[in-house]
Amino acid sequence: MCPHAHPPAKPDHGATTTPERIVHDEKAQLDFSRDMSYGDYLQLDAILNAQKPLSPAHDEMLFIIQHQTSELWMKLMLHELRAAIANVAADELGSAFKMLARVSRIMEQLVHAWDVLATMTPPEYSAMRPYLGASSGFQSYQYRCIEFALGNKNAAMLQPHAHRSDLLAQVQAAYEAPSLYDEALRLLARRGLAVPASHTERDWTQPYLESAAVEQAWLTVYRDPKQYWDLYQLGEELTDLEDAFRLWRFRHVTTVERIIGFKPGTGGTSGVSYLRKMLDVVLFPEIWKLRTDL
């Protein structure tokens, strides 16, 4: 060994890493008497005190949190959808693509959330069902706004919100506004594609009617992706979104059937039978049909 070399340092057994030492070494802030804390910023007191079970059933907490968290995700979904629609209307497709991709990922998150509720067995649900009254996810105003924003318009779906003028105003606004697909078709028309005026200047409150001319416009895009790259990408973003939405709906059906079978829903619908009918709704029909005709 070189005479000037230092021997290897011996481990300092007195400096054992502990949680306290890690926090000390990181200089983490511990006093929030004068600063906004994590809980303050997120308003956790309000959120975590919003679970008010009405029954003695242990599993009601799961039921409440499942639906409350779904409503939070739907709030974000609406935030992104509304911005995406505005961006498509303004020809700002780059921003719209990011927002639509986020909406699809939120829907995937909601698909997986059904796995948690599916741990509730029929007897467990039956123990709390009498306490639900007529309350039902069918009455979710945010979900109705999402359906309307995606083009599934139905005037009858305004009625469940008539008792709350503030909520009715939001649902009514979504009902009367152009949907995401309406704005996509208007964009195609602005780019010179032959979308008929019957589909670009119409009564937005009416259900969308499939059009052979609209399919031809999309076929033009899909037959030459290089020339119409951003419109082609828009078509695929819409496909991703509807694909995710179908999975979300399907998982809803299977979870409800697993828990209550074919009993009527608490909101007065036929339950699973009603949900199965909703699986047949196609939001962007021409984008799906063109795949056969390409």
UniProtKB/Swiss-Prot annotation:
Family stated for the protein in its record: Belongs to the tryptophan 2,3-dioxygenase family.
Listed GO MF terms: heme binding; metal ion binding; tryptophan 2,3-dioxygenase activity
Positions contributing to substrate binding: F63, I64, I65, Q66, H67, Y125, R129, T266
Gene name tied to this protein: kynA
Protein EC: 1.13.11.11
Keyword annotations from UniProtKB, A to Z: Dioxygenase, Heme, Iron, Metal-binding, Oxidoreductase, Tryptophan catabolism
An individual GO BP term: L-tryptophan catabolic process to kynurenine
Function per UniProt: Heme-dependent dioxygenase that catalyzes the oxidative cleavage of the L-tryptophan (L-Trp) pyrrole ring and converts L-tryptophan to N-formyl-L-kynurenine. Catalyzes the oxidative cleavage of the indole moiety.
Organism: Polaromonas sp. (strain JS666 / ATCC BAA-500)
Known catalytic reactions: L-tryptophan + O2 = N-formyl-L-kynurenine
Family matches, as NCBIfam families: trp_2_3_diox
InterPro entries (alphabetical): Trp/Indoleamine_2_3_dOase-like, Trp_2-3-dOase_bac, Trp_2_3_dOase
Subunit structure: Homotetramer.
Residues binding heme: H252
Pathway assigned to this chain's UniProt record: Amino-acid degradation; L-tryptophan degradation via kynurenine pathway; L-kynurenine from L-tryptophan: step 1/2
Protein name: Tryptophan 2,3-dioxygenase
Note on cofactor: Binds 1 heme group per subunit.
